[in-house]
């Protein structure tokens, strides 16, 4: 084999190696294979196992200009604080036994993101009598939009009510379920009237301007136990002044996990059934 033939074979070999390597963008990150992801490459599998949902929610809401209570609840304008008088903020139960909640989803979302949102909604099917259905002409409905943050009204507002799921930070099934639970009328677990028997609020570790987010409410606990594993429970460092300075500590066992990442707990499901009298 002459020298020219050897050089040609060597060049073909090197080109084959180059084509087998992953393509990288300008920042050096691999591109191309995103098997199992939605159209935007965002799915629940992307989640960092060490980041809880409330941390993601509060981080996403840092840049919002929406007036929020407790980090992700739209401040009410048509009723007293966080109270729901005479069940006025609960969704109505139909004669067929289902609580039908109409919704529309903004065209801002990709098909993959719509699938993620509707998949989180379907988590209620089969385990509760709650059914999220696409709106036809119903007066009361949820409008899912991508604004700056992840947030919701508390319960049924009446008419159109926005539920924001920012495309950049809220496209996780657990976050979507968290906000849907707010829309059903559920508050954060650590604001329960009996919370002081189960968690200690470390006021000295909380950003002073955010301390009001830890106020207790006169809640209806539906005869269910305090649930450390609830998807509605803050993580232990929510609104903390510094990393490692926990704002919430479980008691008596400080090592009990809170601020989970896996979706609705058994008691979250039970409360939906009790609140809406599911059979």
Swiss-Prot record:
Localization (cell): Zymogen granule
Report which superkingdom the organism of origin falls in: Eukaryota
- Glycosylated sites: 62
**Which amino acid positions bind Zn(2+), per UniProt?**
178, 182, 188
| Cellular component, GO, one term | zymogen granule
Q: Which InterPro entries match?
A: MetalloPept_cat_dom_sf, Peptidase_M12A, Peptidase_Metallo, ZnMP_hatching_enz
- Which UniProt key words apply to this protein? Cytoplasmic vesicle, Disulfide bond, Glycoprotein, Hydrolase, Metal-binding, Metalloprotease, Protease, Signal, Zinc, Zymogen
Q: Which CDD domains match?
A: ZnMc_hatching_enzyme (cd04283)
Q: What are its E.C. numbers?
A: 3.4.24.67
Top enzyme class of this protein? hydrolase
State the coiled-coil residue ranges: none
Q: Does the keyword Repeat apply?
A: no
Active site feature: 179
| BP-aspect Gene Ontology terms | proteolysis
Q: Which GO terms describe its molecular function?
A: metalloendopeptidase activity; zinc ion binding
Q: How is the cofactor bound?
A: Binds 1 zinc ion per subunit.
Q: Which cysteines are joined by disulfide bonds?
A: 84-89, 129-278, 150-170
Stretches that traverse the bilayer: none
Please, what other remarks does the record include?
In medaka the hatching enzyme system is composed of two distinct proteases, the high choriolytic enzyme (HCE), of which there are two isoforms, and the low choriolytic enzyme (LCE).
- Report the protein name in the record: High choriolytic enzyme 2
Q: Which organism is this entry from? A: Oryzias latipes
């Amino acid at each position: 084999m002459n020298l020219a033939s050897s050089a040609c074979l060597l060049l073909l070999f090197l080109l084959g190696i180059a084509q087998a390597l992953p393509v990288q963008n300008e920042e050096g990150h691999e591109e191309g294979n995103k098997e199992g992801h939605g159209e935007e490459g965002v799915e629940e599998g992307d989640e960092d196992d060490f980041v809880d949902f409330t941390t993601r929610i509060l981080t996403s809401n840092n840049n919002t200009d929406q007036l929020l209570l407790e980090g992700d609840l739209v401040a009410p304008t048509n009723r007293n604080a966080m109270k729901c008088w005479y069940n006025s903020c609960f969704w109505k139960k139909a004669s067929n036994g289902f609580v039908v909640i109409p919704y529309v989803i903004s065209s801002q979302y990709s098909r993959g993101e719509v699938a993620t949102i509707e998949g989180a909604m379907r988590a209620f099917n089969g385990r509760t009598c709650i059914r999220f259905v696409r709106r036809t002409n119903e007066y009361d409905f949820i409008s899912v939009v991508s604004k700056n943050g992840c947030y919701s009204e508390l319960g049924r507002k009446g008419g159109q009510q926005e539920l924001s799921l920012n495309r950049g930070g809220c496209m996780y099934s657990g976050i979507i379920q968290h906000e849907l639970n707010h829309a059903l009328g559920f508050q954060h677990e650590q604001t329960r009237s009996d919370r002081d028997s189960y968690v200690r609020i470390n006021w000295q570790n909380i950003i002073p301007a955010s301390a009001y987010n830890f106020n207790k409410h006169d809640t209806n606990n539906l005869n269910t136990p305090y649930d450390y594993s609830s998807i509605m429970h803050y993580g232990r460092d929510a609104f903390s002044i510094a990393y490692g300075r926990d704002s919430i500590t479980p008691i008596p066992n400080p090592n009990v996990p809170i601020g989970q990442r896996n979706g609705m707990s058994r008691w979250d499901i039970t409360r939906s059934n009790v609140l809406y009298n599911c059979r």
